[in-house]
């Protein structure tokens, strides 16, 4: 996994430089879509098919995109296909997203809640977390009933776990240590 990230990083950084010089929002959508399409098993099979030429693979991939494709994006796909690295696109997209967040002073926040969290409670929680972390946060909410109550929040490497399950685990640890 680390090797994949290492190989994908220069592509993501170069792509980010090109995107910053143009329309970053449009590039973000395109790169995200490219990563999703490259992750589809059928597309992986097409990329690995020895009967198809590199131009055919690039053409099939580009035809699957719904977003407008710039000359630079076509060049990137051609380069990745030529080097048999089309499978790197999901990792390139992930690293591109991290670079964009860093340039905007933003971050993704993974919020796991025991119950569905939306509307005003979610907005209030995100606002509180933005003050704590000093960043604009983009929430991704999942529901995990095993938390019993409360939330588990992860921003980058930092985790805040205020769930009932975590508190019970702390109590168990304290009681068994005594």
From Swiss-Prot:
Family annotation (Pfam families): OSCP (PF00213)
Source organism superkingdom: Bacteria
Record-linked SUPFAM superfamilies: N-terminal domain of the delta subunit of the F1F0-ATP synthase
Coiled coil regions, renumbered to chain: none
Primary location class: membrane
Compartments, as annotated in UniProt: Cell inner membrane
The keyword Transport is assigned to this record: yes
Transport as UniProt keyword: yes
Membrane-topology annotation of the record: Peripheral membrane protein
Keywords annotated in UniProt: ATP synthesis, Cell inner membrane, Cell membrane, CF(1), Hydrogen ion transport, Ion transport, Membrane, Transport
GO cellular component: plasma membrane; proton-transporting ATP synthase complex
Entry-linked InterPro entries: ATP_synth_OSCP/delta_N_sf (IPR026015), ATPase_OSCP/dsu (IPR000711)
Record GO terms (molecular function): proton-transporting ATP synthase activity, rotational mechanism
Purpose: F(1)F(0) ATP synthase produces ATP from ADP in the presence of a proton or sodium gradient. F-type ATPases consist of two structural domains, F(1) containing the extramembraneous catalytic core and F(0) containing the membrane proton channel, linked together by a central stalk and a peripheral stalk. During catalysis, ATP synthesis in the catalytic domain of F(1) is coupled via a rotary mechanism of the central stalk subunits to proton translocation. This protein is part of the stalk that links CF(0) to CF(1). It either transmits conformational changes from CF(0) to CF(1) or is implicated in proton conduction.
Assembly information from the UniProt record: F-type ATPases have 2 components, F(1) - the catalytic core - and F(0) - the membrane proton channel. F(1) has five subunits: alpha(3), beta(3), gamma(1), delta(1), epsilon(1). F(0) has three main subunits: a(1), b(2) and c(10-14). The alpha and beta chains form an alternating ring which encloses part of the gamma chain. F(1) is attached to F(0) by a central stalk formed by the gamma and epsilon chains, while a peripheral stalk is formed by the delta and b chains.
Family to which the UniProt record says this protein belongs: Belongs to the ATPase delta chain family.
Protein name: ATP synthase subunit delta
């Amino acid at each position: 996994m680390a090797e994949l990230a290492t190989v994908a990083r220069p592509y993501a950084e170069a792509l980010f430089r090109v995107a910053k010089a143009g329309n970053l929002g449009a590039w973000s959508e395109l790169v995200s879509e490219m990563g999703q399409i490259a992750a589809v098993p059928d597309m992986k099979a097409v990329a690995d098919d020895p009967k198809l030429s590199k131009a055919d693979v690039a053409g099939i991939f580009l035809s699957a995109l719904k977003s407008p494709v710039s000359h630079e994006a076509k060049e990137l796909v051609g380069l990745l296909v030529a080097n048999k690295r089309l499978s790197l696109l999901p990792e390139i997209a992930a690293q591109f997203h991290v670079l964009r967040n860093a340039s905007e002073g933003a971050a993704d926040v993974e919020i796991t809640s025991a119950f569905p969290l939306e509307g005003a409670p979610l907005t209030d929680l995100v606002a509180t977390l933005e003050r704590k972390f000093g960043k604009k946060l983009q929430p991704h909410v999942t529901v995990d009933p095993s938390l019993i109550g409360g939330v588990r929040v992860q921003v980058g490497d930092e985790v805040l776990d205020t769930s009932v399950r975590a508190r019970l685990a702390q109590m168990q640890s304290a009681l068994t240590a005594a």
